Amino acid sequence: MQRYNEKSFEDLIEKHLLQSKYIKGNPKDYDKALCLDTNLLWEFLKTTQPKQIEELQKRQRGTDLQKNFFERLKSQIEKEGLLKILKEGVEVLGVFFKLAYDKPPNQKNPDTWKNYQSNLFSVVRQLHYSTKNNNSLDMVIFLNGLPLFSFELKNKLSGQSVVDAIEQYKKDRSPHESLFTHHTLAHFALDNDLVYMSTKLEGAKTHFSPFNRGLNDGSGELDRECGAGNPATDSIKTAYLWEKILQKDSLLHLILQMIKPGGKSNTVIFARYHQLDVVRKLCQIVQKEGVGGRYLIQHSAGSGKSNSIAWLACALVGLSKQEKVIFDSVLVITDRIILDRQLQDIIEAFCPIKGVVGAITKGSRQLKEAISEGKKIIISTIQKFPYILEDIPSMRDKKFAIIIDEAHSSQGGKYAQDLAKTTGKDQENQQEDLETFLSKAIQAKKFQPNASYFAFSATPKPETLELFGMQTSQGKFIPFHLYSMKQAIEEGFILDVLAHYITYKDYAKVMSTILNDPHYEKNLALKKLKRYIRDHPKSIQAKTEVMLNHFYSYVHTQIKGRAKAMVITDSRKSALEYFKAFQAQLKQEGYPHKALVAFSGEINLKGKTYSEASLNHMPETYTPKAFEKDDYRFLIVADKYQTGFDQPLLHTMYVDKVLSGVACVQTLSRLNRTHPDKKNTCILDFVNNAQEIIKAFEPYYKQNSLEGPSDLNKPFDLKTHLNNYEVYTQEEVEAFNLALFNNAHLFQIHVMLDAMVQRYSALEKDLQQEFYSKAKAYIKGYEFLVQILPFEDISLEKLFRLLVELIKKLPRDKNPEDITKVVALKQYRLEKEQEAKLTLTGQAELKPFQAV
């Protein structure tokens, strides 16, 4: 009868590897002092580098050749790290030796191909590795006699699991053993269901990360479950490790391309499973389908997105098909200026070929220079990218891979149009009429066939899904690759920010007549009244008191007494008032901490001008660094540091602003960064209710999808509606576009627009609001839809160009700004409404563009 024990699990893995042309290694050939299988290493060197051995023999002057070589190799590994030696080789007495050969892109060079085929992969079971005791490892994988990975296996049918394997590494594998300090890249603990991995053994402090496929295996398909772990298959759940990852070519790619040196000596950055998976799947589909595709990668916060982008950029540079390089250049575009340099540093560190990474900080000439200098990966921000478009006609015959970081915020339409201009085919330099000019303008806004687009986003908007997502047979749009928020939380890479959510409700008694005043538009007056109450010194004073009481009662002892909080406000004025209230109450109560404030620009209040720098008494660029200091515990923000801001000590958020959609997810997600001492988070919300927050998060918890394509009739419907208001005539639309084309004087443009503004002002107030809303919707919708319309319609383009300028001149909001003269706040109080864990199902679906 079959015994389902640990040995049978080892048998299964070994059998598969031996069938894959691994060598069955002999534990007796392993030199414990050198940490090498000396026989296999020397066999590899004799086969691939006999001339170097001969030269080394001459320089040795009769001494023990193998002994000296092995000792030199050991010392270099301990000095430089195994990864560097595998990638760059080792020099012995001036003779250079390679220790591994990567797979060449083709077989043009017989010697290179032969050397690659001469790599010796071996598997050793029950390896006794120590000179101090008789401990053994279940399994070790070697490449050319050098140990790469160790394995501890557990069979769940024998009553043990991956947890026991991890404990075995922590308790029974001394981190001081030579094999574990310098001579291996990673250590795998696994059972039949789960795989965990560590790059450094540190005894009880050893950290193991999941190396699992995820229940959806990276797929964005809608019918798949999402979360941590591995999906059920027709084999053992963890079979992918030996059936795919440990296969020869896969292993070479992994160690030579997807493992990078870490920040500390002899440490490495090992690609997580989803990072390895997305890079490989994208390269495979590009090799299969060629240039011109669009791919959406929805990877949650905590996915290591910057590293994924760096690995992908480096992989695309070297990608070839039929012995031809697929892309001439890889452009990496980010919408966060402060990350431009950071991302460049990561890509440079990850790229195996040095000197091929450049950054655009000025304009088009610098881009041309970068390409002529052989820069294959070029990094820029959205803010700089439009300036490099005009003087680069030579680029338009090249093929591009365009990697877009944080595509959710950059894909309203205009950004993709700028990219399309860069990669578009060159136009003849000739005289052209207005119709030809507009036709070219429309074409320039569309995606170009000589570029592939790779869009990364944790929270893709409907437009992003339609532009870059894959369309299913049911017409829905889904991401090409998905690493869900649910999986990131379950794997411990981010915290669940909705696990402790507190909502407050406020009650106010006001004396006011504005709701019955005909001079005030009712809905707008109500909105102003709510803002008046929210920003009133009484309410800010009361909310500040609640925040500080909560912080010093429950929060400040978290993270071993280092916890910090962020206050989300809805305006610079509100941020300023909160900052003053915090300063006063912190001083009054004798609390030992301070607050910082963050907002852009300046605000003038009661004749005095304030800025972030003047209030904090430091340049605004210093604010994030100052917030790291222990005495600064509160950061009060107004539309700043709500995206892309990583501060692991941030534990609690106080929200006094309406949040919805992607902005809600991004803002609250500032809390999700992990820290060894951070066990939980807390949100205290004065404005939003629990259901509103759940609605915002639902689309991004598991799979995200768009229910169908946009209705291409919508811009035509909006155009008809707008025409019916008779704010402009068709003759005026034509004349305005001709004036723009002919570079008419500014006064002529204003004269044309003023006539339309006069007609707009004569409309009923409700009709004014309708026209304004429809005009904004048209501009936003057209910017997006023009990229995917399968035809040209110049009339849509003409109206778009008119409305972009007209809407800037339309008068808005005639209600007096100062309502304090007709409103008085008499009473104000706060009550806790709810304290709960907000539970997500991930069942929501986004809707396509709709006309207003």
Where are these regions (language model features)?
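ATP-dependent helicase/translocase motor core
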Residues: 1-329, 338, 342-353, 383, ...
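Catalytic cores and motor modules of nucleic-acid processing enzymes
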Residues: 15, 19-20, 46-61, 65-67, ...
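Interdomain helical connector at the RecA1-RecA2 junction of SF1/SF2 helicase-like NTPases
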Residues: 227-235, 463-562, 579
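Inter-Walker segment of RecA-like/P-loop motor cores
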Residues: 348-390
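Conserved RecA-like ASCE ATPase "motif II neighborhood" in helicase/translocase motors
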Residues: 375-406, 410-421, 428-442, 616-624, ...
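Post-DEXD/H (motif II) to motif III coupling segment of the RecA-like Helicase ATP-binding lobe
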Residues: 412-497
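Conserved C-terminal RecA-like helicase domain
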Residues: 530-637
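Conserved segment of the helicase C-terminal RecA-like domain
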Residues: 670-699
